[in-house]
Amino acid sequence: MLAMSTDKLFARQDFFPLWPDEPPGGGGPTGALRISANGSWSNIVSPGIQRFVPENPNGKAVLIAAGGGYRWIGMGREGWPVARWLNSKGYTAYVLSYRLPGEHWQDGNRVAFQDAQRAIRLVRSMENNVHLLGFSAGGHMLGLAAARPDYASYAPQDAIDQIIPKADSVGLIYPVITLEPPYTHTNTHLSLVGNHPSPAEEANWSVQNYVTRAYPPLFLAQAEDDHTSDPENSVIMHDTCRKAGVSVQMIRISQGGHGFGLGKAGTPAAIWDEAYAVWLAARN
């Protein structure tokens, strides 16, 4: 496990702290950022966004949130590789490092959602077209943020918070969508509502319960053999969006499990990225 500051990882112009001072509510971990051997982050003292700029920008930006059950952030498998792949397609990519609920923040289970809203606002302050792409728990977080742009999860900090955190589209890859029974075994469920939540708490953190006709166009991809986030999560979100009149496309992958990122070349899990690229190119 490595420990280092974000200043040593990125040039200052490439990393933007989310908050002007300490994050809402205060508290949080101390010490340096922790990076595991596979590139997963934890001990998130200073949440922010890392920008990847392509050689020939197409005028569209994608905010990426990697997963990790709200216990860590899978930068090495999902964040950075996906950002560089999007760069190859002309998209400016922003990779979000968000606060983790179990790291002693005073605002508890709200902190990642606060960071998601703030990140969308921050990217909107720099870009005209903002698309969201979330994986696993990161998909839960961005999917929920896309559904609740008018919800004030924190008190305004500065002028950036006057921007409505709306997205132009949402891509959710093997996402956690619902925390309601029988889908209660995930780390996302444990991190956000614990072992013995009320039905109201589980419903409050379930993305599908906030979908309206105003939800952005949605792309979903998940493997049928995903034993971490039940594939029914994507089915529930797909069907909810269809009923609400939201444009939605879902890719069902025959094999791949969970957490495959871009997918290994030559495997069924490697099909989603090009399908997403075609879909995203059609979003105006």
Give the residues covered by each predicted segment.
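Catalytic nucleophile-loop/oxyanion-hole region of alpha/beta-hydrolase
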Residues: 74-81, 96-129, 266-271
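Mobile cap/lid helix-loop segments that gate and shape the active-site cleft of serine hydrolases
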Residues: 33-37, 175-210, 216
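C-terminal catalytic histidine-bearing segment of alpha/beta-hydrolase fold enzymes
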Residues: 231-284
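Short beta-strand/loop motif that positions the catalytic acidic residue
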Residues: 214, 219-222, 226
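N-terminal cap/lid segment of alpha/beta-hydrolase-fold proteins
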Residues: 9-57
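Acidic catalytic loop of the alpha/beta-hydrolase fold
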Residues: 179, 225-229
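Primarily recognizes the serine-hydrolase "nucleophile elbow" in alpha/beta-hydrolase
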Residues: 114-185, 202
